[in-house]
């Protein structure tokens, strides 16, 4: 199990950042270089002001050649299941890659807190990834470690980097004048 954590502070009020990321993710995704699209599959209101969202992400990432036979372009993406707690400004999430199903577990939380005297937001994105390639029989031998290392690198480097870009996109949407 490998853990990752990143903290970002942005110059927008925490409630506006939280709501933009929760409610406008497909718009924000259009601003991300590594993301082709985000499509909402499910949105359910939960008890106590919570919200459950399921999104399908499609990525456009250059992959190492070692993954060519394992990851086809049409499976380069993931399902994101998120439970948003509006009272605590917290999101618990789980990512299920479309490639190597059942062999990669990635989950974590995103916490939104007021910063800069209420004029900004401090966002903590943290999680863990567990890869069990050889245990499922799909990949065995020396390739197992290579693929595990590449997938770990993508999740622990690309995902947090894209989260920073997601926050930047949310701030850009907040700053845009409304078209009403």
Q: Each PLM stretch: what is its role?
A:
Residues 1-4, 8, 40-45, 98, ...:
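Soluble, non-transmembrane catalytic domains of enzymes that act on hydrophobic metabolites at membranes
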Residues 1-66, 72:
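Hydrophobic ligand-binding cavity/cleft-lining segments
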Residues 17-21, 125, 170:
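Hydrophobic pocket/interface hotspot
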Residues 25-28, 32, 82, 166, ...:
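Hydrophobic, Leu/Ile/Phe/Ala-enriched alpha-helical segments that form helix-helix packing faces
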Residues 48, 87, 117-119:
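Short strand-connecting beta-turns/loops that link adjacent beta-strands
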Residues 53-54, 78, 83, 92-153:
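Beta-strand/loop substructures that line and gate deep hydrophobic ligand-binding cavities in soluble
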Residues 62-86:
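Helix-adjacent hinge/juxtasegments
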Residues 140-180:
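A conserved amphipathic terminal alpha-helix motif
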């Amino acid at each position: 199990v490998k853990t990752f954590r990143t903290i970002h502070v942005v110059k927008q009020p925490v409630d506006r950042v939280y709501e933009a990321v929760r409610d406008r993710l497909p718009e924000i995704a259009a601003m991300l270089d590594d993301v082709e699209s985000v499509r909402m599959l499910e949105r359910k209101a939960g008890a106590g002001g919570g919200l459950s969202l399921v999104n399908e992400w499609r990525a456009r990432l250059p992959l190492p050649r070692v993954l060519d036979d394992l990851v086809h372009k049409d499976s380069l993406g993931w399902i994101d299941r998120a439970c948003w707690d509006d009272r605590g400004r917290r999101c618990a999430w789980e990512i299920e890659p479309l490639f190597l199903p059942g062999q990669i577990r990635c989950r974590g939380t995103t916490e939104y807190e007021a910063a800069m005297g209420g004029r900004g937001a401090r966002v903590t994105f943290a999680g863990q990834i567990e890869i069990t390639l050889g245990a499922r029989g799909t990949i065995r031998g020396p390739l197992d470690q290579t693929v595990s290392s590449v997938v770990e690198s993508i999740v622990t480097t690309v995902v947090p980097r894209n989260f920073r870009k997601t926050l930047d996109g949310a701030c850009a949407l907040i700053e845009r004048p409304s078209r009403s």
